[in-house]
Amino acid sequence: MTFRVIIVGGGVAGLTLASAFEKAGIDYILLECRPAFDVAVGASIALSPNGARILDQLGAWEKWLKIAQPLVRWGDRNSKGELIMPRSASTPLAKALTGYDMTFGLRRSLLQTLYDNIEDKSMLLPKKSVINVTCSQEGVAVQCADGCSYEGDILVGADGTYSKVREYMWRLADRDEPGLMDPDKKAMTAEYQCLFGISKASGSIAIGDADFIYDHDRSSFIFSDNCGRICYFILQKMDRVYEMVEIPRFSQANAQAYAQRHADIQIRPDLTFGNLYEHSESSILVALEEAKFKQWSWGRIVCVGDSIHKMTPNLGAGASASIESAAALLNSIKAMFDHSPEEGPTETQIRECFAQYQKSREVRATAIVDASSMTTRLQALRGWFEFLFVRLGMPIMGSFAADMASEIWVGATMLENLAPPKASLRGTLPFNPTQGQGQRESKLKRALLGLPFLALLLVAKTATDAKYASALRGYIWESGGMTSAMGSVPLLQRFYSMKGVGDLWSLRYINYLPDFYETNYESLSQAVSSSIDVGIVMSIWSFESIRRANALTMAQIPTLFTFYGQMAGLGRVSPLYYILYYINSPIEVFKGADMRLMHLNYAIAVLPAIIVSYYIPLSAAFFWPTVSGRKSWLFVWQMHPIWTAITLYLFSRIFPSTVKEDRVHGLRRDLPVIKFSMTVLVIGAAGFWMWSRWTSPSSVARVFFPTAVPSTQAPFAACVCAILKWDMLSTFGSTFLWLGYLIWDLKYAGMMQATWVRVAIYGVAAFVALGPGAAIGLGWLWRENILAHKRHKDAVTEENLAQTR
């Protein structure tokens, strides 16, 4: 079959595509208007793991590594050049996550690497400036300024931001389908300008350093390579947003004036941009175009790379995005080529091929353009949100840049006709085409699926709204005591000296009096066992608050929920906690094994913190030998949300934070600590459950399950007992429901093979034998172990590939 592709443009996308065609055995020819393929156009370039994997497939990655510089340390700095947060070791992390370094180097060096990787150089033709394009049912013809003409079946425009091929495609489409391309003719804009340049290295900047400086309406970033050079980028917001036809061009005089105007930028406390510019070897001032074109092809013409998705440089994602698009186009063309008749594909087949290419790539490409745009405006502190996020959010997240980059890397396209490289199969963030930018699960969908939590919340609110109990509680407060089986019990009306705090807790501690001072064994058994089981729920919330995947979500602040739970009842709060968790923590947030990871110093502190702040005061409040002592301890226990937060923080300070090292070398270092802590709590809860079952004269159902809504006609003790039963039913019911949702996520991702019948049998057996708290703890541990050892069914790993062979 005679089939030829004409590529116009010998940049990153064009040369990648040429190499891919050569590997696939598809005839092509590449036309480049410049006299050589390694001309010094542009300053530096970055390659991310998503692009590195494709170069590895083509055999060019190792060649690039010999001349490129891996990114060693990443620093985010304020306008004074001071670090916003501790620097991160980027290269070990990137390689651990994906198998590839984050690298940068000169653009011309990458072009030379791609050029050298192509065996048959006769297909690469320089000095070929396109002056006309014609299409017919039989094929496409390209005429060049030197008088030569070339014919083929497909024309690919890989000729950059101001693509000539795209212009000819628009003209041809306007002739046959007027108006189709009109939106795209206004799609490109520019709001920022940037001075790109190369300078001699400064002594204070080590090889492999990268610094990003955040400032109002301007930003800058630098990279230091292993050849004594610093590549710099100085960005500033322009006076307005320029549309495509009016985007400004700048002269060298403009560039020099721009550099002088920004000479005061503090790259570091002891280094200004002016110091760098004094040793500058080259520089160019350009407007930063941004574009997301909607029509990637028409007829037999298709565009790739910057000609269809143009992004700002702040994420360093442009080159890898172009490489990905080239791979996606090759995949579609190869699939068509392999299933075409002997006489070659028809124009209809070609159009379908191009549509499939755009469908496979557009969502990710658009998401990466948007992410780059957001990063540009974030680093330029565009508004109050950006300012507050940089000042408050980023230090909490710690590795914001790496986590954001992983969203771009994970769902990357690869060449489907070539095997995935071994390096790409061993990362802790396995590539997965169903995850990452543009592939996120809908939060609205998860919110709708989580409506049963709100139903439980409504039940809890209705069942625990005992107006009679509240009224009688006020009467007891005013009278200064209550009558119980133990006789008259005077109230301890003030324990904390601060009036507001004392009144707040004094009024609420009356709710616990029947459980602590009645001789009703059923009430005591229910209160002790339920309170111990609640401690396991509190521990799980504490563990979840220190999980990397839960950064900047409501799960990170369990104190808010536990405090309100003490005020209004945990049964009213837990469904709200769980639906928020479920919405914000789909299985995709665990795409990298490091996202499951917890901060080890905090994980070690959870068990002692819970024991000191929750279980010791609780035990003393129930079993202290004197009534006055029990009342005092009850006041202490009531404020356990505050004490837990304080003790967890203080105990965690005893141990150093190792999360940076653990993300690279210790992904499961926290697991033994978590297992030990939860096992201790489960054993304790199971022991009390068994004790209450064996010693109680009443059935489990009578002791722990409500038989009716609290009645206004019942005695105060009976009313409070019924309220507690409903409160615990909502608390434990919503927790089991939450675990069910989490198991559903695991099964949907193919990470759990157990059937629902098996899960139900295990759950019911654990509940009956060990109690709700122990069953919850074991179920949560089961899930934790799966997250630590299993990967998503669509992840490109050695294990998954072996199963598909």
Curated annotation (Swiss-Prot):
A Gene Ontology BP annotation from the UniProt entry: terpenoid biosynthetic process
Active site (record annotation): 214
Residues bearing attached sugar chains per UniProt: 132
Extent of the signal sequence: 1-20
Pathway where it operates: Secondary metabolite biosynthesis; terpenoid biosynthesis; Mycotoxin biosynthesis
UniProt keyword terms in alphabetical order: FAD, Flavoprotein, Glycoprotein, Membrane, Monooxygenase, Oxidoreductase, Signal, Transmembrane, Transmembrane helix
Annotated membrane topology: Multi-pass membrane protein
TM region(s), chain numbering: 551-571, 604-624, 632-652, 671-691, 703-723, 726-746, 761-781
Main subcellular localisation: membrane
Subcellular location: Membrane
EC number(s) given by UniProt: 1.-.-.-
Binding site for FAD: 32, 46, 107, 306, 319
The keyword Transmembrane helix is assigned to this record: yes
Keyword Signal: yes
Function: FAD-dependent monooxygenase; part of the gene cluster that mediates the biosynthesis of the neurotoxin verrucosidin, a methylated alpha-pyrone polyketide that inhibits oxidative phosphorylation in mitochondria and thereby causes neurological diseases. The carbon backbone of verrucosidin is synthesized by the HR-PKS verA, and further modified by the other verrucodidin cluster enzymes.
Record protein name field: FAD-dependent monooxygenase verC1
Organism of derivation: Penicillium polonicum
